[in-house]
Amino acid sequence: MVIFEKTRGKNSPSVMPSKKGDVSNIPTDMLRTKKPILPEQAELDVVRHYTQLSRKNFCIDTNFYPLGSCTMKYNPRAAHKYASLAGFLERHPYASAQSIQGTLECLYDLQNLIKELTGMTGVSLAPMAGAQGEFAGVAMIKAYHHKRGDFERDEIIVPDAAHGTNPATAKVCGLKVIEIPTKKDGDIDIEALDKVLGPKTAGIMLTNPSTVGVFERNIAVIAKKVHEAGGLLYYDGANLNAIMGKARPGDMGFDVLHMNLHKTFATPHGGGGPGAGPVAVNDKLKEFLPVPMVGKKDDKFVWLEEKDVPNTIGRLSAFNGNIGVLIRAYIYGAMLGGNGLTEASEIATLNANYMMARLKEEGFTIAYPDRRASHEFIVTLKPEFLNYGVTATDFAKCLIDRGVHAPTMYFPLLVPECLLIEPTETENVDSMEKFIQAMVEIRDIAKKDPQYLKGAPYNLPARRLDDVKAAKELDIVWQPK
């Protein structure tokens, strides 16, 4: 029930009357002719309504959240605490650089940390989400070729095991997407790559480790071939949590990347807060970085704008990035340090391999059984589908009934009936075992009563939804009857 439907007459709290403003300068077609439709509820009723809704929310603070390729790790409260200090929290976007030297120093240090972690030489913190970071990265590749007069390079190569947003990003930037396959062992098909490389190649977008959860072993060969063809390498940082302190994209031959701070650096996801997708580049692309960036002149920290970076692809927002998120990421990096970040990747990888081994031990089918998992892995439920008629969706709905958020389903598309599972480093053995036992229990039920799975979930406020109707008859705005 939405709060509007709870209105029962005049229950709204009293509001002190205010002086009416002058509306003479407002066009008449923009003036309201009817009273706004607002819920009439007492303050206590409003508090209760939203508190009850929050209890129905599924979040990392209350449950295991093994959503593959999303890195749903715990967000340390210390980062929230210090990012909420008055000097950070009350900073106005238009405040002068001179008055926010502490904030700028933190951002400057974060830029340097990202350079060191990724092996790149230039960083912009301007992108306000991972997708915007992707856009900035591909836009820089396009700007690089156009500055060289290479206008015919309009193709981006995207493996079928790349992160799902990559093709969309290339399209938004006005480039053509050329898909290449992944081999049965999880590596890119080099022969297929050779066939599509040429004078129209602008670059290739890769996630490494890939979305199938394995490290691309031929990355050095791929980098050499793409560069020899005149293209650039884009690194999607979706899976960077697997290799912090172990390998650097810049050392692999990548020219540009974006990081998802809401994944790798434990800042809040989605409804928990805005994102941040910094971009990092090598010397080839530094002149194209989006502004603003933080620089240092005469021992003072300054904003670098268009006049300082004349070939920049420009601004991505009105202000200077999601600084509240960036400060949280800075604090996370400062708390862990280089050794701590490396250990985080080690434990994330250990947890993924533990879960993969245990599920294999319990008889589940691993998509790439001969490869070590990076920070995530894939279980294919194709045998369960063929034997009992149950799907990955059925398993997912039953997992939610058992207090575990479902892993990513049906992605990557090249593995049938798949669950992409990523435990992250912040989970312990008990929570992972709870998930494993839930999977075993659900499969046991499927053997005896597959229809039971078709009706799940049973213990949630909303039962199984009609996905087809939801897609065809989208209704996301409440209107009075």
Swiss-Prot record:
Modification type N6-(pyridoxal phosphate)lysine: residues: K263
EC number: 1.4.4.2
GO molecular function list: glycine binding; glycine dehydrogenase (decarboxylating) activity; pyridoxal phosphate binding
Descriptive protein name: Probable glycine dehydrogenase (decarboxylating) subunit 2
Lineage: Bacteria, Pseudomonadati, Pseudomonadota, Gammaproteobacteria, Thiotrichales
Cofactor(s) listed in the protein's UniProt record: pyridoxal 5'-phosphate
Species of provenance: Francisella tularensis subsp. novicida (strain U112)
Keyword Oxidoreductase: yes
Function of the molecule: The glycine cleavage system catalyzes the degradation of glycine. The P protein binds the alpha-amino group of glycine through its pyridoxal phosphate cofactor; CO(2) is released and the remaining methylamine moiety is then transferred to the lipoamide cofactor of the H protein.
